[in-house]
Amino acid sequence: MALNLRKNHQILKIINDALIDLPTPSNISTWWNFGSLLGICLITQIVTGLLLAMHYTADTNLAFSSVAHMCRDVQFGWLIRNLHANGASFFFICIYLHIGRGLYYGSYLNKETWNIGVILLLTLMATAFVGYVLPWGQXSFWGATVITNLFSAIPYIGQTLVEWAWGGFSVDNPTLTRFFALHFLLPFVIVGLTLVHLTFLHETGSNNPLGIPSDCDKIPFHPYYTIKDILGFVLMLSLLVSLALFAPNLLGDPENFTPANPLVTPPHIKPEWYFLFAYAILRSIPNKLGGVLALAASILVLFLTPLLHTSKLRSMTFRPLSQILFWTLVANVLILTWVGSQPVEHPFIIIGQLASFTYFTIILILFPLAAALENKLLKL
């Protein structure tokens, strides 16, 4: 009998075991589509980014004009740029939904997969930040100045660290050049980490909405989930293309249409929408180092979720108290996002402080308490 190449060829075998013959729970819902959507986002960003890099000049005198030239004179350059800028937004929408799914269904109990995922989130945030600096508009320049300056809050070595990162005494040409180098490099780091993420995931197999072992009821990934994923791709790419064609600047800052000027500070310096929740947490602490620590903690707290799991049930499907807390947390993050976009004045300061406090309280205290209480109520 002839060998089946798909199952025996050294390289095809890896693809087969990951995308074709992979045993998958039969009941995973659409919330499990976001992993593959993130893969598509990554591919889209690398392709569009590569095409943009071919026309971009990483120099303070030329960066802004090179981006303008791309949009005016390069064939479909405007489309490539709009897809790349809005693709970042979709990347973050997908990753936040993916993390939310993981929190709700207890997927974080696959500890290695979860920890690599948090590292992936941090890498993605770094990539988006350095990328936002490249067009060298006002928001780019001042965003870079404000955020890199946060490192100066680190005791003793802070100032030295910031000047080393800048390559001088302020954000200038060396900063732009190194940010371009990093922005080119990091997506490939993300690809590598993604492969590690998948390797760990395929050691244990996917979780499912019931949070129970599904070894007795597995189906092959292809054709069931390949077709389901393709539907997800079509829907997401349709939304991305619609946004890029009909409202390309909807999520951007108008300030970035003004070339960078170190002598003029914009009235409101705020990051892109996907960083606003963390920015609100940073601003709600009236101390530089405290704010920086809270900002770091807002993401790093995800590393603690596997350690804080007290429930005897994995998923929240049958845990109404935890569900209420989960959706309160979602609303809380949306409030933080809104507060982060507002100026620092009376009602917003206190709302931001309350929302920041609630964010950490829910994750660190209320989730474990509610789960322990549910164990009691359900006599587990």
Curated annotation (Swiss-Prot):
Matching PROSITE patterns: CYTB_CTER, CYTB_NTER
Family matches, as CDD domains: cytochrome_b_C, Cytochrome_b_N
GO MF annotation terms: metal ion binding; ubiquinol-cytochrome-c reductase activity
Binding site for heme b b562: 84, 183
Membrane topology listed for this record: Multi-pass membrane protein
Keyword NADP on entry: no
Required cofactor(s): heme b
Compartment annotation: Mitochondrion inner membrane
Membrane-spanning parts: 34-54, 78-99, 114-134, 179-199, 227-247, 289-309, 321-341, 348-368
GO CC list: mitochondrial inner membrane; respiratory chain complex III
The UniProt record lists the keyword Oxidoreductase: no
Top-level taxon of the source organism: Eukaryota
Any single GO BP term: mitochondrial electron transport, ubiquinol to cytochrome c
Keywords (A to Z) from UniProt: Electron transport, Heme, Iron, Membrane, Metal-binding, Mitochondrion, Mitochondrion inner membrane, Respiratory chain, Transmembrane, Transmembrane helix, Transport, Ubiquinone
Co-factor remark: Binds 2 heme b groups non-covalently.
Pfam family, one: Cytochrome_B
Binding site for a ubiquinone: 202
InterPro entries: Cyt_b/b6_C, Cyt_b/b6_C_sf, Cyt_b/b6_N, Cytb/b6-like_sf, Cytochrome_b, Cytochrome_b_C_euk/bac, Cytochrome_b_N_euk/bac, Di-haem_cyt_TM
Binding site residues for heme b b566: 98, 197
Job description of the protein: Component of the ubiquinol-cytochrome c reductase complex (complex III or cytochrome b-c1 complex) that is part of the mitochondrial respiratory chain. The b-c1 complex mediates electron transfer from ubiquinol to cytochrome c. Contributes to the generation of a proton gradient across the mitochondrial membrane that is then used for ATP synthesis.
Subunit structure: The cytochrome bc1 complex contains 11 subunits: 3 respiratory subunits (MT-CYB, CYC1 and UQCRFS1), 2 core proteins (UQCRC1 and UQCRC2) and 6 low-molecular weight proteins (UQCRH/QCR6, UQCRB/QCR7, UQCRQ/QCR8, UQCR10/QCR9, UQCR11/QCR10 and a cleavage product of UQCRFS1). This cytochrome bc1 complex then forms a dimer.
Family: Belongs to the cytochrome b family.
Additional remarks: Heme 1 (or BL or b562) is low-potential and absorbs at about 562 nm, and heme 2 (or BH or b566) is high-potential and absorbs at about 566 nm.
PANTHER family (alphabetical): CYTOCHROME B
Protein name (Swiss-Prot/TrEMBL): Cytochrome b
Name of the gene: MT-CYB
